[in-house]
C-alpha cells in the first residue's frame, strides 16, 4: 500500500496544463502587485509627507476591492469566466499604465493616484473571484487541496521577494519604473491565461444582479457548514492583524531595526512551511474538526506571542501561528469549493474573500483602539485570548462543521 507523503506534491503543475498556466500568471501578477504596493505609498508620502494620505489610499483601494469582489462574484456566476478573468487583468494593466504616465509628469496628480487606485482595486478583485470560481473546473474537486497549497506557497514566496525587488527599483529608477514594470507584468500574464479552456458558468435563470448577490448571502447564512467556514476565515484574518503592534512590541523587547524584520517574516515563513507540509491534509477524514482545532491553536499562539520574555520566542509563536493558520486556510478553501453548489461558486468565493479583507481591516482597527488604552503586550494577548474564547464557543456551536466527515481520496503511486 502506498503512503501519502507529508510534503506538498507539485505533480499538478505537470499533469494539468491549465493550472500550470494559472500558476505562472499568478506568480507574475504577485510580483507585479508587489512592485505597485511599494511604489504607491512611497510616492504619496514623498508628495504629501502625510501618513494619513497614505492610509487613505489604502482604504480607498480596499473599499474598491470589496465592491469588486461582490460584483465579480455575480459576474463569475453569469458570464464565461475566462472572459471575465482576461477583461479584469487587461483593465488592471491600463490602470498601471496610467500610474506610470502620471509619475512621469513634472507634477504628478495625487487625485489621479487615488482614482487609479480605485480602478485597479475594483478590477483586480473581479479577476480574483472569477479565477477562484473556475479552479474546480481546471483541476477537479479531488485536487483542490493540492492546488490551494501550491497557490499559497506561490503567494508567500512572491510576497517576500516582490517588495525587495520593488525597493531596489525605487532606489535605481524611481516609482515610474515600478509602475511601468507592474503594467508590463500584468499584460504578460494574459499570455498564459489565453491558453485556458472555455470556462462557462453553470446554467441558471436570469435575475437582477442585486437579487443574485442576496441569494449568495442567504445561502451563506442558511448553511451552517459553509457559513461556519466563512466565519472562521474572518476571525483568522482578524488575528493576523497583530502586525500593527510589531513596532510597539519591538520597543518593548528592545529589538534592533534588523531584528524587527524577523517579526514580519515569521508568519509568512510559518505559512510557507504549512503549505509545504500539507501533503496529508486532503486525506483527513474529519477536516471540519481539524480546521476548528488548528484555528484555536493559531489564536492561542497570538495570545502567547506578546507574553514572551524574549523576542525570539515571540517569533516562534508567530511562525506557529503562520503554520496553523495555513492549515486552517487550506481546509477552508477546499471545503468551501467542494461544499458550495456550482451555481453559487462565484458569489460565495467573492463573499469569502471579501470577509477576509474586512476581517483584516476590523482587526487592525480593534488592535489600534486597544493599543490606545492598553500596553502593546496586553493588546496582543487580549486579542489572541479573546479570539480563543470565541473560537471555543464556535467549536461547541458549529456542530455540523465539527462532525463533518469525508471519504479520503484514493492514494495512487503518483501521489506518494
Swiss-Prot record:
It is found in: Cell inner membrane. Gene3D superfamilies: MFS general substrate transporter like domains. Residues 1-21, 77-83, 131-156, 200-218, 278-287, 337-356, 400-416 are cytoplasmic. Keywords: Cell inner membrane, Cell membrane, Membrane, Transmembrane, Transmembrane helix, Transport. One of its GO terms (molecular function) is enterobactin transmembrane transporter activity. InterPro entries: Enterobactin_exp_EntS, MFS_dom, MFS_trans_sf, TM_effector. Residues 43-55, 105-109, 178, 240-256, 308-313, 378 are periplasmic. The chain crosses the membrane at residues 22-42, 56-76, 84-104, 110-130, 157-177, 179-199, 219-239, 257-277, 288-307, 314-336, 357-377, 379-399. Its main location: membrane. The keyword Membrane applies. Component of an export pathway for enterobactin. Belongs to the major facilitator superfamily. EntS (TC 2.A.1.38) family. This is Enterobactin exporter EntS. It comes from Shigella dysenteriae serotype 1 (strain Sd197). The gene is entS.
Amino acid at each position: 500500500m502506498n503512503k501519502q507523503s507529508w510534503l506538498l506534491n507539485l505533480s499538478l503543475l505537470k499533469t494539468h496544463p491549465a493550472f500550470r498556466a494559472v500558476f505562472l500568471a499568478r506568480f507574475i501578477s504577485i510580483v507585479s502587485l508587489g512592485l505597485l504596493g511599494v511604489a504607491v505609498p512611497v510616492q504619496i508620502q514623498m508628495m504629501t509627507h502625510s501618513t494619513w494620505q497614505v492610509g487613505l489610499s489604502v482604504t480607498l483601494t480596499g473599499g474598491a476591492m470589496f465592491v469588486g469582489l461582490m460584483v465579480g462574484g455575480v459576474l463569475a456566476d453569469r458570464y464565461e469566466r475566462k472572459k471575465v478573468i482576461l477583461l479584469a487583468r487587461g483593465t488592471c494593466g491600463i490602470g498601471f499604465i496610467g500610474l506610470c504616465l502620471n509619475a512621469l509628469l513634472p507634477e504628478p496628480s495625487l487625485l489621479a493616484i487615488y482614482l487609479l487606485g480605485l480602478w485597479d482595486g475594483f478590477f483586480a478583485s473581479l479577476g480574483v473571484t472569477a479565477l477562484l470560481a473556475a479552479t474546480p473546473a481546471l483541476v477537479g474537486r479531488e485536487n483542490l487541496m493540492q492546488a490551494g497549497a501550491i497557490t499559497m506557497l506561490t503567494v508567500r514566496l512572491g510576497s517576500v521577494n516582490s517588495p525587495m525587488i520593488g525597493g531596489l527599483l525605487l532606489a535605481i529608477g524611481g516609482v515610474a519604473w515600478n509602475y511601468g514594470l507592474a503594467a508590463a507584468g500584468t499584460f504578460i500574464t494574459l499570455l498564459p491565461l489565453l491558453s485556458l479552456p472555455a470556462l462557462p458558468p453553470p446554467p441558471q435563470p436570469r435575475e437582477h444582479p442585486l437579487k443574485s448577490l442576496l441569494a449568495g448571502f442567504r445561502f451563506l447564512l442558511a448553511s451552517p457548514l459553509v457559513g461556519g467556514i466563512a466565519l472562521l476565515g474572518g476571525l483568522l484574518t482578524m488575528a493576523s492583524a497583530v502586525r500593527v503592534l510589531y513596532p510597539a512590541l519591538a520597543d518593548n523587547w528592545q529589538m534592533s531595526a534588523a531584528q524587527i524584520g524577523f517579526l514580519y517574516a515569521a508568519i509568512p515563513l510559518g505559512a510557507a512551511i504549512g503549505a509545504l507540509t500539507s501533503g496529508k491534509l486532503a486525506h483527513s477524514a474529519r477536516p471540519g474538526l481539524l480546521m476548528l482545532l488548528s484555528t484555536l491553536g493559531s489564536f492561542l499562539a497570538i495570545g502567547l506571542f506578546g507574553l514572551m520574555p524574549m523576542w525570539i520566542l515571540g517569533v516562534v509563536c508567530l511562525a506557529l501561528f503562520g503554520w496553523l493558520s495555513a492549515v486552517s486556510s487550506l481546509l477552508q478553501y477546499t471545503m468551501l469549493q467542494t461544499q458550495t453548489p456550482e451555481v453559487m461558486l462565484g458569489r460565495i468565493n467573492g463573499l469569502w474573500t471579501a470577509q477576509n479583507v474586512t476581517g483584516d481591516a476590523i482587526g487592525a482597527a480593534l488592535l489600534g483602539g486597544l493599543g490606545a488604552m492598553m500596553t502593546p503586550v496586553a493588546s496582543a494577548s487580549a486579542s489572541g485570548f479573546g479570539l480563543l474564547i470565541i473560537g471555543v464557543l464556535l467549536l461547541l456551536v458549529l456542530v455540523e462543521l465539527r462532525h463533518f466527515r469525508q471519504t479520503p481520496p484514493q492514494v495512487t503511486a503518483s501521489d506518494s
